[in-house]
């Protein structure tokens, strides 16, 4: 039966007790992580968020009643112990911070009993994720998950402190706002007071932080909750958290400077990792040409090589056909993989097809320097030698080629180089490689909508020298946009914003938005632009992704206390769920039943 803790005050967390406290009385509280009965002695590993502390129950010290209670303890019971800190009676446990001491218990109170948990509360368990998420309150007790959540809190706290010291003001922006076009789907909230009308949960604080710049708050920050109704991936959630900021009277270099110093500060304080400054910069075009990705992983090489000029006159129709259609032929060199079995090469071909390739061509260079190739019969010996030389091919290498439109070739080889690097063990999670990617295209063509859409968002300022092409050649316009990339993952992005009303109007028209639609959706921003707008720029980090990489995890679900799963549901609470008819009536909502075909 559970006992009261009245009259008790915890004096220490478990790992706050040390050898310096030997001989002192302490009161500790937590969960029973493990219990060992040695007959006349009982040992308990007591766990709280700080770690583990060993408790010794000796009948000669605690008395028979207390010893009997200790005998009844089971894993996950919540207990309070008063006792004296003593030197460990047995061998020192070098794996524990408190491994040289223990508490000789004088009193024991059982504050709460526990049923047998559905999985062990230990590190590196093999329990399926859906079970762990269903019992998330238990999962969060495990040290490896707990350390992630604690790290997340530390990153947020340090970020606030750093930016406050840089003159930023933390200002909250609305959670119930207006649905606007562009971007992902909004989560909509029906209004009871205004039947038939809806709020939208913010995809970002973008418009409000720009209006704060119009209002004279020249440095804004917020740890902001954001919502996007889109399909989930390993690094996506329907609700997520941004480190959001905006600055007035700045240019690209000013924003990058603040954020480089922020990143260096966070990595030093949290991980004791030195970030070399300045961080490397690369234009979007260079990143795509060299790595096939706008978020390249720089922990390894395997750069793309454009071999179009070498193969343009060969007899291989796959290559020449791609070039005749305005595409390119590019390849990567998987060093030391020339002896890869055909079965594995076929698996790589299937992988490439998943990214849009029609196939992959390859050259395997044998140790004697001879070649095995899927297209050798279409090439002269001189052409093959020139191709291998251009690829820096050596004995034992595997050369892989894709031929198609540039967008497909980049997509295929960009993904393939990461897949190969993973197979080759080149992705060291302790090696942090940062990169700024700059000068993104202002627009990208949407085949689905048959129009240009904003690559970032419609408030991004074009490069000054490209402004004249907004109407005549939008596909060639570059943006004053920048992403910060870490180990192949975009952890943040931002841009210089449009602050002239006429340029913003031209941007809307380039996106196919009429003046009427633009005013309907963004009139509040355009009105603010009428009364003096400072040049401004900003950036937002995905806090979840940043902490995921810092914690060396593979999924952001491991660094979020209560995450959703891939169908955007919560296994802990069973949200989303049906609501009763009265609630729907109050919101003027009627649910139509799906019609079934007879």
Locations of the language-model features?
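Class II aminoacyl-tRNA synthetase catalytic cores and aaRS-like
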Residues: 1-598
């Amino acid at each position: 039966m559970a006992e009261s803790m009245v009259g008790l005050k915890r004096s220490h967390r478990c790992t706050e007790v040390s050898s310096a406290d030997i001989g002192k009385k302490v009161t500790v509280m937590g969960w029973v992580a493990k219990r060992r009965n040695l007959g006349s002695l009982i040992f308990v590993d007591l766990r709280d968020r700080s770690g583990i502390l060993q408790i010794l129950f000796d009948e000669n010290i605690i008395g028979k009643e207390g010893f009997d209670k200790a005998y009844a303890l089971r894993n996950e019971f919540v207990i309070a112990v008063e006792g004296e800190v003593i030197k460990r009676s047995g061998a020192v446990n070098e794996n524990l911070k408190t491994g040289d001491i223990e508490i000789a218990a004088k009193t024991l109170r059982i504050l709460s009993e526990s049923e047998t948990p559905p999985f062990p509360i230990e590190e590196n368990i093999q329990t399926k994720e859906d079970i762990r998420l269903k019992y998330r309150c238990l999962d969060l007790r495990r040290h490896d998950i707990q350390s992630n959540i604690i790290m997340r809190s530390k990153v947020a706290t340090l970020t606030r402190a750093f930016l406050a010291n840089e003159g930023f003001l933390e200002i909250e922006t609305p959670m119930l706002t207006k649905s606007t076009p562009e971007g992902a789907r909004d989560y909509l909230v029906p209004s009871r007071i205004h039947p038939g009308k809806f709020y939208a949960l913010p995809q970002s604080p973008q418009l409000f932080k720009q209006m704060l710049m119009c209002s004279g708050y020249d440095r804004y920050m917020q740890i902001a909750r954001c919502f996007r109704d889109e399909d989930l991936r390993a690094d996506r959630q329907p609700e997520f958290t941004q480190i959001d900021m905006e600055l007035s009277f700045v240019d690209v270099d000013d924003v990058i400077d603040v954020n480089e110093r922020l990143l260096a500060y966070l990595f030093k304080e949290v991980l004791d990792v030195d970030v070399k400054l300045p961080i490397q910069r690369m234009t979007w075009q260079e990143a795509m040409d060299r790595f096939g990705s706008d978020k390249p992983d720089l922990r390894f090489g395997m750069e793309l090589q454009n071999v179009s000029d070498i193969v343009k006159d060969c007899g291989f129709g796959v290559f020449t056909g791609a070039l005749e259609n305005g595409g390119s032929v590019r390849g990567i060199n998987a060093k030391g993989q020339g002896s890869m079995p055909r079965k594995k090469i076929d698996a790589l071909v299937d992988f490439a097809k998943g990214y849009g390739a029609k196939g992959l061509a390859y050259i395997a260079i044998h140790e004697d320097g001879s070649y095995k190739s899927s297209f050798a019969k279409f090439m002269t010996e001189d052409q093959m030698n020139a191709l291998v030389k251009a690829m820096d091919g050596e004995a034992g290498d595997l050369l892989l080629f894709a031929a198609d439109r540039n967008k497909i070739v980049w997509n295929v080889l960009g993904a393939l180089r990461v897949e190969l690097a993973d197979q080759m063990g080149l992705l060291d999670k302790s090696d942090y490689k940062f990169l700024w990617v700059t000068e993104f295209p202002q627009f990208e063509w949407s085949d689905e909508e048959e129009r240009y859409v904003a690559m970032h968002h419609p408030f991004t300022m074009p490069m000054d020298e490209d402004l004249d092409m907004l109407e005549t050649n939008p596909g060639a316009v570059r943006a004053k946009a920048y992403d910060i990339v870490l180990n192949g993952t975009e952890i943040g992005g931002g841009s210089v914003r449009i602050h002239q009303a006429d340029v913003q109007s031209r941007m809307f028209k380039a996106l196919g938005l009429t003046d009427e639609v633009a005013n309907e959706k963004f009139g509040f921003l355009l009105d603010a632009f009428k009364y003096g707008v400072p040049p401004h720029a900003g950036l937002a980090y995905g806090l979840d992704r940043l902490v995921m990489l810092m914690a060396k995890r593979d999924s952001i679900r491991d660094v979020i206390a209560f995450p959703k799963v891939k169908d955007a549901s919560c296994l802990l609470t069973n949200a989303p769920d049906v609501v009763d008819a009265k609630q729907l009536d109050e919101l003027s909502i009627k649910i139509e039943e799906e019609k079934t075909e007879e």
